[in-house]
Amino acid sequence: MMTIREYKKAESLEEAWQLNQKKQNRVLGGMIWLKMENINVGTAIDLSGLGLDTIEETEEGFAIGAMVTLRQLELHPGLAAYTDGAVRESVRHIVGVQLRNLATVGGSLYSRFGFSDVLTIFLAPVSYTHLRA
């Protein structure tokens, strides 16, 4: 069971980062993986208003936001074409569409669960993952 004492919708990445410096505070995304823990959260940090839910295609590659859902990854035509369907295949068998509509790339990478098919596709030699601690 998860208990949340306070909720804050971050207005900037800097604010979210500052809030997340306290050990008891947690970042919220799709909340799929947080439900697997028995935790007390001081402040729940909502990133939904920061525009991190987009996939941008550039000449160099793709910029994938932390709040992009697994379903967005699965259905993105540019990623499918660029990876010859590998991204789509890495997520399409994960539970069901309902879960993929909620689970986020950021949560899937940050949690580092051994069962994460998403983690594997981001380990490809030509991918770069930028994490800010």
What are these regions (language model features)?
Residues 1-132:
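C-terminal structural segment of proteins
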